[in-house]
Regions:
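Short, well-structured beta-strand/strand-turn elements
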Residues: 44-46, 59-73
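Intrinsically disordered, Ser/Thr/Pro/Gly-rich linkers and terminal tails that flank
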Residues: 16, 95-137
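Sec-exported extracytoplasmic/periplasmic mature domains
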Residues: 1, 57-61, 130-137
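Gly/Ser/Thr-rich loop/hinge elements
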Residues: 1-36, 40, 44, 74-78, ...
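Short, solvent-exposed amphipathic alpha-helical segments in soluble enzyme
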Residues: 53-59, 80
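Extracytoplasmic/secreted envelope proteins and their assembly/folding machinery
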Residues: 34-37, 49-53, 119-130
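Active-site-proximal C-terminal subdomain of hydrolase catalytic domains
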Residues: 53, 62-67, 97-100
Length: 137
């Protein structure tokens, strides 16, 4: 991006007043990448990877391919119980630059195809990445 870009917003799910925090990506004044970017995701893309996915999808040079993310991107709220146990509750609601919330659904790519398949999923993943780099996908 040449200028700051709004990429996502977040707010605490249990807040009585919905006060969103808007997040922007601001380009560096030193060096920046402005070329095409292909983002590959799968159901193994989860949590911070999904927040990163939302941020990259807001940039005009990003093409999102692969399979939908897992759909588990909320921050947690820790609560200690009287017996000393700790319970972690999903607490943060994220929405992308278009206002979409992907929690529980996963972020779908614009071009869908399996990323990990067959008897050797790591090899099929490597072959897929090779095809993308070589322009065959």
């Amino acid at each position: 991006a040449q200028e700051p870009v709004f990429v996502l917003s977040e707010y605490p799910a249990d807040a009585p007043d919905r006060i969103e925090q808007r997040r922007n990506v601001t380009p560096s004044d030193k060096s920046r990448y402005t070329g095409d970017l292909t983002l590959v995701t799968s159901n193994m893309t989860v949590s911070a990877g999904e927040i990163f996915t939302m941020a990259l999808r807001a940039l005009p040079q990003t093409t999102h391919v692969g399979a939908p993310t897992r759909g588990a991107l909320s921050d947690v709220l820790d609560k200690q119980l009287p017996n000393g146990w700790v319970v972690e509750l999903s607490n943060e609601v994220y929405s992308d630059h278009e206002g979409q919330e992907w929690e529980g659904r996963g972020i779908p790519p614009s071009q869908r195809f399996a990323v990990f398949t067959g008897d050797n999923p790591l090899m099929t993943h490597a072959a897929l990445i090779r095809q993308i780099v070589e322009g065959q996908r």
